[in-house]
């Protein structure tokens, strides 16, 4: 990334982020299980994928030297399960707060449709797509533009700001936690194996278990 002009590096970060946010806004406004919902999620995935195909590291799923894929995936899954448990405990409280519970219940309606397999597939694809963009493309671009600490903060802030488009307040807390821990894993290992495992274990767990609360 360092050999690319600063303006291009900024565009690599901002253009997909804006397009992705617009797609997520479309997802949020689409009726549960509708063709519009699945089309919007497909568009969001394509935004992340195209950004990675253009500027991503093809070795981003290779384990760090001296480490193994199993170890890094295990760390990611372990952290994802811990965060899942914390969020489910939080759901016991937030389900009684109408302003917080209603948007979550609307989002969870997508897990109550006949084509559940399609919803889960889009969830997984977009989880992987977000990691390809935020924890590979955007991370490396920001690392080339800012100090390590500033880059980490900007990575998390970017992820939270894009998630705002979903219009679900509790997702902002989720994006803050997931954004921080996945960014730390990506920095530690220099790839997105652990980050993707964390993201998918948390998001799929939330998708199947949160409807029990809302």
Regions found by a protein language model. Give the residues of each.
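Juxtamembrane helix-loop-helix connectors linking adjacent transmembrane helices
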Residues: 60-126
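Residue-level signature of transmembrane alpha-helical entry/exit and packing/kink sites
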Residues: 5-13, 37-41, 68-76, 114-119, ...
